[in-house]
Amino acid sequence: MRYTLAVVGLIVAVALFGGWESRGGGSQSSVNAAAAEASPWDSLSAQEIQSAATAVKQRHGRGVLFNRISLAQPDKTTALQWQSGQQAVRQAAVSFRADGKTHHVIYDLSTDSLAPTQIFDNGQPMLTGDGEMTPAVAQINEDPALLGALAKRSIEPGDGLCLPRTTGRFFDELVDPVHDRLLRLDCFYIKGQGGIGILPSTAAFARPIEGLSVLYDLEKQAIVEITDSYPNGGYPPHDIAALEYHEGALETRAPLRPVTASRPQGVNFTVTGGRVDWQGWQFYLRFDPRQGTVLNRVGHLTPEGFRSVAYEIAMSEMFVPYYDTDAHWFYRAYFDMGEYGLGNTATELKGSDCPSHAEFQNVVLHSADGTPKDVPNRICIFEHDPGYPIWRHHESLYDGVPGMENHQSRSATELVVRMVATIGNYDYFQDYVFAQDGRMRVRLVATGIDATKGVMAASMADPSAEADTATGTLIAPHLVWVNHDHFFGYRIDMDVDGQNNNFQRHKLRAVPQPVDAPRQGIWAVTTETVTSELAAQTQMDVSKPALLVFASADQTNAMGYPTGYQIIMPNVRPLVTLEDATHERALFVRNNLWVTRFKREELFSAGLMVNQSAPGMGLPQFVADDETITNTDVVAWPTIGFHHVPMAEDWPVMPAKVDEIILKPRNFFDRNPAIDLPN
């Protein structure tokens, strides 16, 4: 073969699982996690992961394939009673495959005991890289039938590479999509071009081998079907310009004069074990193979004590459906977090990923056999100036008055906790951003490469262009990027000044006035306290504006208002029917916001086992009992994202697209909490 299987394996590791390395090193923050006692919210240590894996193997045999070993949700009451210096109650949640079935079990780390194992008949756990996808790719790319299909297109062995995708719940005429563990692979032409010589192209997704796909059974280690077809015969060209985008492959513009940020006197944040303190903010940070970075016990440390805002903040699911009914495209709708894992696909942060003054943290993940892996520099923490003052006022009344300080402004500084996941062709930054005025942002930045479809048309003047672009945009000759959506669902366990909270809609409404009133255009705000889970389902409507607020049921500010936090997010919802075969598995996208009564086991908006899952899992099940949500512990489930209509400027790598959730104090403080910043 032109490229050895070692090269193929490297490509797959980088493309799908960020190139794990079983080593330490890298720039480390001033945290000695090993020396600090573990809190209830710290990530599992390597020793804890190993202990959990060993216990499961002792019960189920050594043929276990571990999909996720992570910190189990602690009992909330017990966790909140924990004090530094005490022994925390810690458990591991373990999802694994054994004997062709999906298992889930809780392992108690303090007692070295396993709870009864739960077997799932609907839905499967995340795919593993080293245990499933990498060996599957190596096998498939040597298969004689596949090599024959490539040879028909004059593609030499090693110049084509087929990469794995999840299948959803399709192909029931060929397999059992409920119980079989499946992959669908689509193929790309990776022969090197230009200055990179014999190495494969770094633009691996730029040249699809359209009309060729493979259905593969992971546990039988067998190809189910090779589909080799294209409408109207023939195939789009694959040996086209890859538009290599790495430095050295294209002419770059003249460099800018340096624009730098520095920390000559050190950082203003401290990291103690998993706890981070900065400018009155305090939170615990951990890393999960599925969710990536997770925050716990988020709040403000004040002279009067700790004031909570949220008990936990984490992604709960991603959903990226493509909209093309072609035989090689109809199944493409990815639950990127639940199928691949935001943490498992996190890549090492380097280059321009973080500012030069950032501090980095390693994390511990695990292989498919349960072996812990120390992977470097998956988290960075840094401060930055957002470029505008946090507040400012110029009092023009006193212009020119001697001795009057009539201009006041204060520089803003923000704290950012960052990770980046590369899930196949897309790269996702997940930032938690803390401000000095009490605001906190959950920011998701999408960049990378769109899924590329090969077509006959080289320009919109070609006869096939209209049909070729029916479901997307011609972004380069013979390449269409297909229309799709990005939905990012989060779970935010709101604890505003304690666990007893209410969900309120502050509705802005026009108020009719008497005909003889001096004004006819008046609006006012009325507050609705929502009483049940079903009533709390929120679909935003620009014609009916409302502030969405989580308010304490017990605490008020100096003026007597319930202390609260407002949640702000963009309005994005599906354009298609939710009876669609992919969307009925992602019903969390039906609403911009759901609110549920807290339950320890309700963590994922599309269900615990989302790969090849059944319709209606997750949030629709959580709210089916329509529990009351007044004066109690409630959880917010916001969804953000965007409809992606591709354009030429997205090629070859898409500019960063920012979406965010804002948590903003509303009567939580008695004044602007940033008013005391020095000039």
Q: Predicted segments — roles?
A:
Residues M1-T4:
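Positively charged n-region of N-terminal signal peptides that target proteins for export
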Residues A6-V12:
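Hydrophobic helical h-region of N-terminal Sec-dependent signal peptides
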Residues V12-A35:
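Bacterial Sec-dependent signal peptides at the C-terminal "C-region" and cleavage site
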Residues Q28-K57, G234-A254:
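N-terminal pre-domain segments of enzymes
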Residues A33-D42, T117-T128, I140:
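Charged, low-complexity surface segments at secondary-structure and domain boundaries
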Residues P40-L80, T128-D172:
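Short, non-transmembrane alpha-helical segments in secretory-pathway proteins
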Residues G61-T111, P157-D217, Q279-W281, V417:
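Exposed beta-strand-loop-beta-strand "reactive/processing" segments of non-cytosolic proteins
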Residues L109-G129, K191-T293, R297-R439, V445, ...:
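Extended effector regions of multi-domain proteins
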